[in-house]
Amino acid sequence: MSMEHKLGIVTAGSLNKGIEVKLDGAASIEDMAVGRYVTIEGHKRRFFGMITDVSLGVTDLALTVSPPSGDDFLSEVLTGTSAYGSLHVAPYLTIGGTETAVDGPQPVKTIPGHFSPVKEASAADIELVFGKEDDKKFWIGNPLDMEVKLCLDLQTLARRSNGIFGKSGTGKTFLTRMLLIGLLQKSAAVNLVFDMHSEYGWAGTFEGKGRKVKALKQLFPSKVAVFTLDEENSKRRGVSTDYVVRIGLEEIEPEDISLLRQTLNLTDAAVEAVYQLRRHYGKGWFSAAEGIEDSETLEELKIHESTFQNLRRGMNTIRRLPFITPNAPGDVVDSILKYLESGKHVVLEFGRYTDITAYILVANLLTRRIYASYRDRTEKAVAADTGYPTPLVITIEEAHKFLNSGVASQTIFGTIAREMRKYSVTLLIIDQRPSGIDDEIMSQLGTRITCLLDSEKDIDAVLSGVSGKNELKNVLAKLSARQQALIFGHAVPMPVAFTPREYGSNYGDWGEAAAKVSDEEIEDLWK
């Protein structure tokens, strides 16, 4: 079927509920698929929309009681007339008119008239709406059942915090790796990746096939630094690392322990005791607490003995982490900042230390200090109206552990998400349980990319606050279990279901070919 082939005509609809399209007899309903694009030719403008449902209808209910069973000729005569197929189309954009000539496709504010012809969207239509691949736009894949490139403006993406969601095994890691490569290629931002399963630094795994694929350091050796918490594991995997991370006890703050309350099974009283110890002993509170053996000291601190024993068990869990030392040999935050300030991207691999305690502690501790540095630099840049820091995207996995309703208001990650791009720092969060993330945080995400989700709660959470939620629910529910995703939000003019581009067999289009961004462009990006 030609891409310009007429599919049918508009028969009913509304702006809020969508448009009903009656298929022509020549158009096979089996060729129609939820998530595909169509254009509607109105009298004054064209409308660009997405198929959100496919159905069958009849003009005479008697046909459903006495269908022409076994009579191919009669079936052919009735199909398209008395019996027909219908499409439900959600209109998103208008193309044409004086506004479009100046500003491009516009959000839809009206609907086409009765009997307006409906066609499949062409490659030219997709390029008009989403743009062509260039020095700013990055090719992320293809719209469902189309060969045209779907491109994303990564500088626009990096201006807000974003999320990648999907149940286990649907391709979240692949999509994350692809977006990180895009941010590198287009120099849209620098990345700090807290890499729980060592997928983004030197090499990753090809989901579903088990084989290794190149990750950021191999593709961009001069632009990526790999930090590791587990030097032995990195050497065994043949990874070229730039820094071995050690965390000193004096770097641990009460906020870090508070975030670990559930993980360490701490009581509220035990968390409050941490703040009391910090006030009394200062930065050396952790070591001082380890040395407390008598009840008199606890009485002086107004800490109950059972509370202290609960806290000590949690502290012992942290103390046993191999990368925790009494005195760190160097300042890891200063080292990370030096790389970021020079335009290099940092991937922190956790190696064998994939326990959630280690991940939450390290990610929160480092992010808090890095954010403070970016805040100071941005405030100075605003005062001087120059020298803005390069936008920083911080990537975290298992995001619901940092951003659930119980802790989101207290963590640095919640602060970053709520402030959007105020201090040149945004988040890229990856999670298979979006329902576990605080509603306010979800509402602050600029762009969401979601693979297949099973739970109704997760689907509702990822689509919360989105116009046309029910229609997108149908699209999301029909995605394949692998290699299909739905993207919507700030960085795209309208939702689009797509197949991500191929990665892992040929790296010719993925390597070190990024154009550099000037200081003026960086300043413009954050104004």
Region annotations inferred by a language model:
Residues 1-165, 174-179, 386-388, 409-410:
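Basic- and hydrophobic-enriched, low-structure N-terminal and domain-boundary segments
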Residues 47, 55-57, 93-96, 197-201, ...:
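Conserved nucleotide-binding/hydrolysis micro-motifs of P-loop NTPases
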Residues 78, 417-499:
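Conserved ATP-driven motor cores of ASCE-family P-loop NTPases powering translocation/secretion/packaging/pilus
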Residues 135-228, 439, 487, 508:
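Glycine-rich phosphate-binding loop of nucleotide-binding enzymes
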Residues 156-157, 183-187, 217-220, 339-340, ...:
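Conserved catalytic network of the ASCE P-loop NTPase/AAA+ motor domain
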Residues 188-192, 342-345, 389-393, 422-428:
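Loop/turn-to-beta-strand initiation segments
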Residues 198-210, 227-415, 481-491:
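P-loop NTPase motor domains
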Residues 482-527:
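Conserved P-loop NTPase motor module
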